[in-house]
């Protein structure tokens, strides 16, 4: 059914899978937005439009607390030549909450996360990237129906769960057929019928484990094993059945999401994906970090074991990651990190418009600041030129003169 499928795990994978897909688009991109403030993804979309890619974006008008920001996003995207619409049926009672992107009718993404700096760097979230004309076509069919405000008939044979059309029935069937285990990551597990079914399965001897937030634990029946995710804010919506099938997407297991909102999830049974998901679930359940090739691991590998910098990098810190090359990562250590064209800088940018000693980053007790060193062409944070010292936070986008962009990440 598909040529290739990949799992996106946040925090960790950041914007890279999304930007790579946007950058290789030739003809068309369809995207739904509930919330979005990531400047790298926004810039990639604008650049794709400038090279002739047809882009359509459905932007929610009912995202709580984001109404003004989404209106501004819609206006800016329209000015950039991107076709935008607000779903005609979007309302506070029946929000269009689904999170998807298709590229060139061959590649599709289904996300649990919004492309915001918070979701990309501070929340436990997942996404599925799949190369499948059939699945991309079915998602595009849904998108077109919502774009034109037309009825949609879901294909029950598809691996997609579409609310409010067939998600409840498909999810109920999957849970009912569980034989060995049910694992759920969902901070809004509230639907009475789903909870009752989970209790029934638990009483039949099938372990049911739920990862959620602290407030949720007191509301679930005792038959359901519960733990709160301590390390991140849990925003994922993921159900793993018998360790071999997973449902990932925008849909919480609550009545609004199942029966009223527009939601989209996908069923996955790929062995490698399930191994990754099970490992992440166990690490969050046990409150320990999984073994992975994350940013910290890659920085440590850049040093020989005997090198003293390796021990220093093992402690929490920051890195600058290049947008153009995800493997180009500059560690920001305690003290001063200098940036410029001269070879003696800690971060060397070979761009003639970058000053020899352009800027410096200071890290002191977890507080990170950027200072422009009276450069000729300026230092920029999230597109705005800075003067003097600027406090930084993870997720900020840094640019020096007209150089490539760097994202600041915490590790």
List the model feature ranges, each with a label.
Residues 1-26, 32-176, 191-245, 249-273, ...:
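HKD-type phospholipase D/PLD-like phosphodiesterase module
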Residues 15, 168, 346-347, 382-387:
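Short alpha-helix capping/helix-loop boundary micro-motifs
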Residues 29, 359-361:
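Buried hydrophobic-core signal for structured, non-transmembrane domains
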Residues 99, 237, 351, 387-390:
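Short, surface-exposed secondary-structure edge patches
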Residues 102, 109, 240, 247, ...:
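A general beta-strand register signal
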Residues 103-104, 241-242, 333, 355, ...:
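Structural motif
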Residues 297-352, 362, 397, 402, ...:
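Intrinsically disordered, low-complexity acidic Ser/Thr-rich regulatory segments
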Residues 363, 369-371, 376, 380-411:
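C-terminal boundary/linker segments immediately following FHA domains
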């Amino acid at each position: 059914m598909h040529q290739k499928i990949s799992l996106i795990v946040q925090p960790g994978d950041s914007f890279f899978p999304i930007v790579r897909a946007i950058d290789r688009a030739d003809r068309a991109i369809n995207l739904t937005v509930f919330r979005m403030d990531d400047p790298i993804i926004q810039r990639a979309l604008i650049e794709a439009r400038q090279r002739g890619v047809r882009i359509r974006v459905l932007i929610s008008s009912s995202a709580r607390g984001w109404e003004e920001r989404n209106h501004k996003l819609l206006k800016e995207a329209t000015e950039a030549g991107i076709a935008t619409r607000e779903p005609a049926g979007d309302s506070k009672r029946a929000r269009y909450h689904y999170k998807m992107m298709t590229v060139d009718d061959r590649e599709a993404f289904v996300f649990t996360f919004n492309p915001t700096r918070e979701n990309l760097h501070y929340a436990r979230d997942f996404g599925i990237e799949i190369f499948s004309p059939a699945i991309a076509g079915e998602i595009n069919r849904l998108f077109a129906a919502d774009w034109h405000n037309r009825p949609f008939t879901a294909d029950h044979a598809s691996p997609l769960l579409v609310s409010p059309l067939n998600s409840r029935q498909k999810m109920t069937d999957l849970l009912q057929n569980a034989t060995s285990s049910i694992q759920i990551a969902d901070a809004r597990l509230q639907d009475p019928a789903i909870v009752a079914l989970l209790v029934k399965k638990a009483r039949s001897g099938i372990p049911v484990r739920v990862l959620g937030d602290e407030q949720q634990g007191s509301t679930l029946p005792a038959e359901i094993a519960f733990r709160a995710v301590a390390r991140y804010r849990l925003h994922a919506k993921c159900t793993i059945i018998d360790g071999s099938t997973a449902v990932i997407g925008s849909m919480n297991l609550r009545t609004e999401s199942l029966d009223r909102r527009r939601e989209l999830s996908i069923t996955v049974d790929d062995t490698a994906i399930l191994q990754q998901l099970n490992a992440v679930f166990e690490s969050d359940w046990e409150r320990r970090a999984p073994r992975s090739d994350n940013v910290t691991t890659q920085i440590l590998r850049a040093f020989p074991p005997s090198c003293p910098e390796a021990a220093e990098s093992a402690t929490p810190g920051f890195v600058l990651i290049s947008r153009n090359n995800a493997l180009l990562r500059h560690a920001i250590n305690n003290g001063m990190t200098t940036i410029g064209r001269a070879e003696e800088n800690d971060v060397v940018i070979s761009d003639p418009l970058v000053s020899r000693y352009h800027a410096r980053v200071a890290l002191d007790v977890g507080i990170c600041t950027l200072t422009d060193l009276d450069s000729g062409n300026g230092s920029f944070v999230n597109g705005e030129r800075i003067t003097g010292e600027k406090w930084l936070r993870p997720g900020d986008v840094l640019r020096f003169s007209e150089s490539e962009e760097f994202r600041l990440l915490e590790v």
